[in-house]
Amino acid sequence: MAVAHNLGFPRIGADRELKKALEAYWKGELDEQGLRQVGRQLRARHWQAQLDAGIELLPVGDFAWYDQVLSHSLMFGVIPQRFRPAEGQATLDTLFAMARGVARSCCGGAQAQEMTKWFDTNYHYLVPEFSVDQQFQLSWTQLFEEVEEAKALGHAIKPVLIGPLSYLWLGKLKGEADQTQTFDKLELLDRLLPVYGEVLDRLAAQGVEWVQIDEPILALDLPQDWKNAFERAYNLLQRAPLKKLVATYFGGLEDNLGLAATLPVDGLHIDLVRAPEQYPVILDRLPAYKVLSLGLVNGRNVWRCDLDKALEVARHAAERLGERLWLAPSCSLLHSPVDLEREDRLDEEVKSWLAFAVQKCSEVATLARAIDDPQDAEVQAALARSRAVQAARAQSPRIHKPAVQARLAAIEAKDSRRTSVFATRIELQRARLQLPAFPTTTIGSFPQTPAIRLARQAYKQGRLSLGDYTEAMQAEIRHAVAVQEQIGLDVLVHGEAERNDMVEYFAEQLEGYVFTRFGWVQSYGSRCVKPAIIYGDLSRPRPMTVDWIRYAQQQTDRIMKGMLTGPVTMLMWSFAREDVPREVQARQLALAIRDEVCDLEAAGIRIIQIDEAAFREGLPLRREQWRHYLDWAVEAFRLCASGVRDETQIHTHMCYSEFNDVIESIAAMDADVITIETSRSQMELLEAFRAFDYPNDIGPGVYDIHSPRVPDTAEMVQLLEKAAECIPAERLWVNPDCGLKTRGWPETEAALVNMVAAARQLRAARSAKVA
């Protein structure tokens, strides 16, 4: 008998009920009792949905008010001093203060904890803050309360914990530099393990038989001391009187396989979607008493599982393992939308190819039933439907476009190279553009006012004509241009009033994308995103931005910059196809964007920015796999940017905090100008560019757009002087960290006035020095 179980379920609700309740609570429109009631309703509904889909062992503890890592920080008492409530007891407001830097009755104006990507997903977690003298204690009982809830409903359950090694790995040491630089956070393990033991003992006392302990870092390159720590930790935790399933996901175990197989636990979950090659090896290495859970259904994408293919593996495993076989999605379904059945307006053919969280649970259950009762009528019907879907999708003319494939096949090496090297190009560009030293610009977007959003909503709902919508957006463009001219910026942007999202705006105009109404997934806290779905070969039927940018250029004699989203970012922030490699999809996107770049150039646009915000996010978890990814990601950017003349200047923008390990690839992109987020690091990130001797122009962000604070001119001058120590002054641009979409106009204008003043001050100082 194969057990159908699940590692985790989306917590936001099919209608984003959690998001709405959280935001109502933060605004004071919903009290804590009301918020907790929404949480209970969602948990009960989600457990029932999984049960109805055929899941036998339900996850408990996958729900979180904001983030599962943050919930663990509260449970273990990892609450930074600035958030500790005076009365000593952690509350929901404590949790939200840690996440948002805001609380209604405590903690003052404390800065929120750092947030970063959860491995290589688009989910973000709150980074635990450890101190050298960190103590751990059981401080938050939400998990135990949820266990009682589920038991009261009569469910068979499996509580979910983040394992002690992964939890420590995900955190950061905070405090005095002289202490944190010499202290290894792994030394905290012995202090943390007793609290884990206490949690496990308490779960056992509640009658829990199995607990799932997530250790996703087993899919990473681990130092030897961390590998050794795994054995020590789980030797101690084996004393707890309940069964433990260690769950790994997002990649293969590789050199950690032997370690994972021999840990003193009762079961192991492996991801066979990301790493199918590990199956035969783990089967041979797993001790005969252990359960093996196979992740055969993709928990991170939206495509239906090929049930015949998955069943072939499951049947083989059943022959070897018998009742020790469990089946599950590859990872938590947190990364999947909730329920495909809500999509009442989705193209029926494309819809037949998809599966969201509820449907993925059904697929897992079908596989388990197919092991136990292969002739079951429902099983046979499900397998027949799966075969029909796979065949229809493989043959669909909507997916496979001969013209796109012919164009891909015709790509030559020269298509990914500019005509001349940067040193030649930059002289031609400077002669054409006639910009001053320290040229000023912005990253692209200006404030999205309520009026802009209402106009776009009315247009999409058919309440505003195309003509009236165009007129409204043109008025916003005229306003943005006038403001920039008045401030004195050198290179202007049109402000992107017509764009709701930097990916969706372009995806809506490309063939090969489809969009959902309810395909929301959690990004962090109450923020949800609705990624577009790439279902077929990608192409651009017509220009996407040219009319808007041309109109903006007509409003000014100054240089207007075209604004596009790059192919890698388009791919990373979409649900990608599974039937062709990601690099093929990136090339298709690159060709579509290349056409837009060339059309912008033909329209007289002299500077074109191609944003690659997600370039680094695509890096595989294992460093040995980086080179392949970086090669095709760089090639995709160059392919979209290399169709223009030397005189046309190509910019790119990246907004993340680590460049050292990818600086060669960033240089290989060969953008004429790269703008980057540096203000919060006080320009320290530029050290990577100096050490590498980065050859092209750079625009280090001189102020943080994530804050409404307006920095003064002297502060920005200081940052630019610091930047000039790393980058030759003739190659420095002056710009904010990122786009200004989320800011208001008053602070935007005030900050840009000071930024332009800072650039002029540096020009004057440089002129005086030359004189």
Swiss-Prot record:
Binding-site list for Zn(2+): 653, 655, 677, 738
Keyword field: Amino-acid biosynthesis, Metal-binding, Methionine biosynthesis, Methyltransferase, Repeat, Transferase, Zinc
Enzyme class: transferase
Names of required cofactors: Zn(2+)
CDD domains assigned: CIMS_C_terminal_like, CIMS_N_terminal_like
Span of the signal peptide: none
UniProt-annotated binding residues for 5-methyltetrahydropteroyltri-L-glutamate: 16-19, 117, 527-528, 573, 617
One Pfam family recorded for the sequence: Meth_synt_2
Catalytic activity: 5-methyltetrahydropteroyltri-L-glutamate + L-homocysteine = tetrahydropteroyltri-L-glutamate + L-methionine
Chain positions recorded as L-methionine binding sites: 443-445, 496, 611
Protein's pathway: Amino-acid biosynthesis; L-methionine biosynthesis via de novo pathway; L-methionine from L-homocysteine (MetE route): step 1/1
Gene Ontology terms describing biological process: methionine biosynthetic process; methylation
Annotated cofactor note: Binds 1 zinc ion per subunit.
Intrachain disulfide bonds: none
Catalytic residues in the record: 706 (proton donor)
Protein family (similarity comment): Belongs to the vitamin-B12 independent methionine synthase family.
Function: Catalyzes the transfer of a methyl group from 5-methyltetrahydrofolate to homocysteine resulting in methionine formation.
Name of the featured protein: 5-methyltetrahydropteroyltriglutamate--homocysteine methyltransferase
Organism per entry: Stutzerimonas stutzeri (strain A1501) (Pseudomonas stutzeri)
Gene name for this UniProt entry: metE
